[in-house]
């Protein structure tokens, strides 16, 4: 029996459930084990205040202590600094990485009047919303997805911005009034992706879990998180990134794969946003992340991050 550790929220158990079901379909016995994390216990505190790894540390300790065999994380919650005790055995196919607007009266972002109150506790989302210059008021937002959605339906907020992937996984895409394109708002690095982690030395389990791995997703996540790590920015920093594997055709008509990466760094107040893009190949995803990070540095990203503080 493969014991899979997960947080207890509906979203977390649904995500982990997809991994459990895939393992069962492949002929392996698997079950979910609920693990309480500090992020769940301190649901009202801003994530940036609690610290890096707030949703993942307890799951990792459960693996280390032998309480579970593996854990399923929202990949974007994992600290960028590697922990030698563990390995990412699988990165399953990624959900749509875009952010989603859930607004009153079916409104899209451009239709919200100046002064509208939008909920988000993500510095990245808040900074990019402010940078659009729409005169929106940003309010802190924590709690599970149902709680967040209710703050719009109750009239407390005019809109919220959340990850589209989360709403898709719990079957609430009906609430989305607009999927925000990356040109409007770059997602968090690794948004919409899952990380299936196990003990570094558990090669037999890692081999089983690797059946769930998607090479294109792994390449994209590697590029995005390399950029994030190189910027020395934590998962709460105002940094956005999205990488995609795309097919191109060379001059001889042959199809080949490229990896594109877009990244941005913003000031917390949205007064300045620096953007950079790059093209590479999936097998050199890390190098692409490094090169786009270097371009961001050349454009002044270091000063912007120093202004907002860094946290690995």
UniProtKB/Swiss-Prot annotation:
Keyword match Transferase = yes
Q: Which UniProt keywords apply?
A: Porphyrin biosynthesis, Transferase
Q: How is the cofactor bound?
A: Binds 1 dipyrromethane group covalently.
Needs which cofactor? dipyrromethane
**What's the catalysed reaction?**
4 porphobilinogen + H2O = hydroxymethylbilane + 4 NH4(+)
Q: S-(dipyrrolylmethanemethyl)cysteine: which positions carry it?
A: 235
EC numbers listed for it are 2.5.1.61
Gene Ontology biological-process entries:
protoporphyrinogen IX biosynthetic process
Gene Ontology terms, cellular component aspect? cytoplasm
Entries under Pfam families matching the protein: Porphobil_deam, Porphobil_deamC
Q: Name one GO molecular function term.
A: hydroxymethylbilane synthase activity
According to its UniProt entry, what is the function of this protein? Tetrapolymerization of the monopyrrole PBG into the hydroxymethylbilane pre-uroporphyrinogen in several discrete steps.
Q: Which family does it belong to?
A: Belongs to the HMBS family.
Q: Subunit arrangement?
A: Monomer.
Protein name per Swiss-Prot or TrEMBL: Porphobilinogen deaminase
Q: Which organism is it from?
A: Mycolicibacterium vanbaalenii (strain DSM 7251 / JCM 13017 / BCRC 16820 / KCTC 9966 / NRRL B-24157 / PYR-1)
């Amino acid at each position: 029996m493969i014991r899979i550790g997960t947080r207890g929220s509906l979203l977390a158990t649904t995500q982990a459930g997809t991994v459990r079901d895939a393992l069962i379909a492949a002929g392996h016995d698997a079950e979910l084990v609920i693990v309480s994390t500090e992020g769940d216990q301190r649901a009202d505190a801003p994530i940036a205040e609690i610290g890096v790894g707030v949703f993942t540390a307890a799951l990792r300790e459960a693996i280390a202590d032998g309480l579970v065999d593996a854990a399923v994380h929202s990949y974007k919650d994992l600290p960028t600094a590697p922990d030698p005790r563990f390995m990412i055995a699988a990165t399953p196919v990624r959900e749509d990485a875009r952010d989603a607007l859930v607004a009153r009266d079916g409104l899209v972002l451009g239709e919200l009047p100046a002064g509208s109150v939008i909920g988000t506790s993500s510095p990245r989302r808040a900074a990019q919303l402010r940078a659009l210059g729409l005169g929106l008021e940003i309010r802190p937002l924590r709690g599970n997805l149902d709680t967040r959605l209710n703050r719009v339906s109750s009239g407390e907020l005019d809109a919220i911005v959340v990850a589209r992937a989360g709403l898709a996984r719990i079957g609430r895409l009906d609430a989305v009034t607009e999927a925000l394109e990356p040109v409007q708002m770059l997602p968090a690095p690794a948004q919409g992706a899952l990380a299936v982690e196990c003990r570094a030395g558990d090669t037999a389990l890692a081999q089983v879990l690797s059946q769930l791995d998607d090479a294109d997703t792994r390449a994209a996540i590697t590029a995005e998180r390399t950029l994030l790590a190189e910027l020395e920015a934590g998962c709460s920093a105002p940094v956005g990134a999205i990488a995609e594997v795309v097919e191109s055709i060379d001059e001889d008509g042959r199809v080949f794969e490229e990896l594109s990466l877009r990244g941005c760094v913003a000031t917390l107040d949205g007064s300045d946003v620096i953007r950079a893009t790059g093209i590479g190949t999936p097998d050199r995803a890390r190098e692409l992340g490094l090169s786009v990070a270097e371009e961001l540095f050349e454009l002044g990203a270091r000063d912007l991050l120093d202004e907002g503080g860094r946290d690995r």
